[in-house]
Amino acid sequence: MRGLKNYIMTFEPPIHWNDYEDIAMKLYERFGDEFNEGKIYRVRFTDLHKWVMEIPKFEGKPEESNEGHLEMIQSTWVYEWRDNQK
């Protein structure tokens, strides 16, 4: 039972392109305050796409990405950054 409890407590479901909040939290964990609001909005989508693909447990396929997903990830990352400035 102990093993199952540890597994349940550490299980993280896979992340996909529409999991904007999960992706934003992972990006903030990776970059922290290195990227402020202005820098986040200036990130090239090609770089953002690459960084999302590098997130552990990310199971989205590159071809499933689109500009709408990347815009939502970018704006959600800004909100995550703002929340951590308090």
Residue spans for each PLM region:
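N-terminal amphipathic/basic-hydrophobic helices that include classical n-h-c signal peptides
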Residues: 1-7
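A charge-rich, low-complexity, intrinsically flexible signal that marks solvent-exposed coils, linkers
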Residues: 7-86
